[in-house]
Amino acid sequence: MPKMKTHRGAAKRFKKTKNKIKRGSAFRSHILTKKSPKTKRHLRAPHYVSKVDEPRVIELISTY
């Protein structure tokens, strides 16, 4: 059986912490002028993968 390979796209997007998986925030790349400062400030906060999606993400980055 061949080696399990890390999904490189997922490896760049997710970081594994002690007990959660950190992810980037959506809606932050462009068209920021119409967004309020409060919205942009909240988007800077850390975001985590939901418990339901964690097994799928772990499968993609398991060898990483």
Swiss-Prot record:
Q: Which residue ranges run through the membrane?
A: none
Keyword flag Ribosomal protein: yes
Instruction: Read off the InterPro entries from this record.
Output: Ribosomal_bL35, Ribosomal_bL35-like, Ribosomal_bL35_CS, Ribosomal_bL35_sf
Cellular component, GO, one term: cytosolic large ribosomal subunit
**Disulfide bond positions:** none
What is any one GO biological process for this UniProt entry?
translation
Q: Which Pfam families match?
A: Ribosomal_L35p
Q: Where is this region: Disordered?
A: 1-23
Molecular function (GO) terms listed? Answer: structural constituent of ribosome
Q: Which domain of life, per UniProt?
A: Bacteria
Q: Which family does it belong to?
A: Belongs to the bacterial ribosomal protein bL35 family.
Q: Which PANTHER family match?
A: 54S RIBOSOMAL PROTEIN BL35M, LARGE RIBOSOMAL SUBUNIT PROTEIN BL35M
Name this protein carries in UniProt: Large ribosomal subunit protein bL35
UniProt lineage: Bacteria, Pseudomonadati, Campylobacterota, Epsilonproteobacteria, Nautiliales
Protein's gene: rpmI
